């Protein structure tokens, strides 16, 4: 049953996810495409994690954080993709209240964690390029673990703020969520809580996360650019640029899409456009990150070649 009656109102116990389309043919096409993307995402990111773990030459802070970013990408994509694939195969796409809660928390947690990890990786590049003599001290194992734990705590706190905004919501009747997953904005639109909707915790925490992480990334790359421009060696400049290009690409893709969805005025784009961009940053970007970080990284390509050669000739 979708509703439970009590003395005061009708409580929703499940939601209907309207998804991306009602067209049966398009559903089959999207199912095939997104399934392929998800399989590439999982295999690509797990391969990245395994390669970093087994290759001693990749046991550096940058790759330590990259392996955790790959883990986050698997978790982030798995938050919505399996359920979305299952919904393509059924006529009525439903999700329980508990399932919606878990999806909301997981999406906020992994999304926030990705923000913090991207900022941490920018700081790591700043230390490596601008203060190379202090790198082993500034980015020691203890410091890396502290930064990682801080990122996870930040992700948990921001995700908890989403639950603080979600739990007080009252759903008096309509339970059709105009999205393919449980995001806070369409859930608030669906609620009958009126002007008392407690969206302040989620809004404040999310804004804080975005401002802080963007500030760290911007300051880090400003100093990196200044340092690179001061280099006299062309080879040194090219090496420094190649080190940062992949990370900057990942940052631009991720922050560009979340800015489109969460920062731009809602009147400037339609709900369907919102859904398409959401698919890009929750499904496509996790697939692209392993490619972005490996194609332009000679150390990763070299480690992969050595591991393959070892397997072939062993």
Swiss-Prot record:
Glycans are attached at residue 8. It comes from Mus musculus (Mouse). This is Olfactory receptor 5P50. GO terms for molecular function: G protein-coupled receptor activity; olfactory receptor activity. It is a multi-pass membrane protein. Residues 50-57, 124-136, 221-240, 296-314 are cytoplasmic. It is found in: Cell membrane. The chain crosses the membrane at residues 29-49, 58-78, 103-123, 137-157, 200-220, 241-261, 275-295. Potential odorant receptor. Its main location: membrane. GO terms for cellular component: membrane; plasma membrane. The keyword Cell membrane applies. Keywords: Cell membrane, Disulfide bond, G-protein coupled receptor, Glycoprotein, Membrane, Olfaction, Receptor, Sensory transduction, Transducer, Transmembrane, Transmembrane helix. One of its GO terms (biological process) is G protein-coupled receptor signaling pathway. The keyword Protein biosynthesis does not apply. Pfam families: 7tm_4 (PF13853). The gene is Or5p50. Residues 1-28, 79-102, 158-199, 262-274 are extracellular. Belongs to the G-protein coupled receptor 1 family. PANTHER family: OLFACTORY RECEPTOR (PTHR48018).
């Amino acid at each position: 049953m979708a509703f439970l009656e009590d003395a005061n109102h009708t409580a929703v116990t499940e939601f209907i996810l309207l998804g991306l389309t009602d067209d049966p043919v398009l559903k089959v096409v999207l199912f095939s495409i997104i399934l392929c993307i998800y399989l590439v995402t999982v295999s690509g990111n797990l391969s990245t994690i395994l390669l970093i773990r087994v290759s001693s030459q990749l046991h550096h802070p940058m790759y330590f954080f990259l392996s955790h970013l790959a883990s986050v990408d698997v978790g982030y994509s798995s938050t919505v993709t399996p359920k979305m694939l299952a919904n393509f195969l059924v006529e009525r796409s439903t999700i329980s209240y508990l399932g919606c809660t878990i999806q909301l928390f997981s999406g906020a947690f992994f999304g926030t964690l990705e923000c913090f990890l991207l900022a941490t990786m920018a700081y790591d590049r700043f230390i490596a390029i601008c203060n190379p003599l202090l790198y082993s001290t500034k980015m020691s194992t203890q410091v890396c673990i502290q930064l990682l734990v801080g990122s996870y705590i930040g992700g948990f706190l921001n995700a908890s703020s989403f639950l603080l905004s979600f739990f007080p919501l009252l759903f008096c009747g309509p339970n059709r969520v105009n999205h393919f997953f449980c995001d806070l904005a369409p859930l608030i639109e669906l609620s009958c809580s009126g002007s008392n909707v407690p969206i302040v915790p989620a809004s404040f925490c999310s804004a804080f996360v975005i401002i802080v992480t963007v500030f760290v990334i911007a300051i880090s790359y400003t100093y990196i650019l200044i340092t690179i421009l001061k280099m006299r060696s062309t080879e040194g400049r090219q090496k420094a640029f190649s080190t940062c290009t992949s990370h900057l690409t990942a940052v631009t893709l991720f922050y560009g899409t979340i800015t489109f969805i969460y920062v731009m005025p809602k009147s400037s784009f339609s709900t369907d456009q919102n859904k398409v961009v959401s698919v890009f940053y929750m499904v496509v970007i996790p697939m692209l990150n392993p490619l972005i970080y490996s194609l332009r990284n000679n150390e990763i390509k070299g480690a992969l070649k050595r591991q393959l050669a070892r397997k072939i000739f062993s």
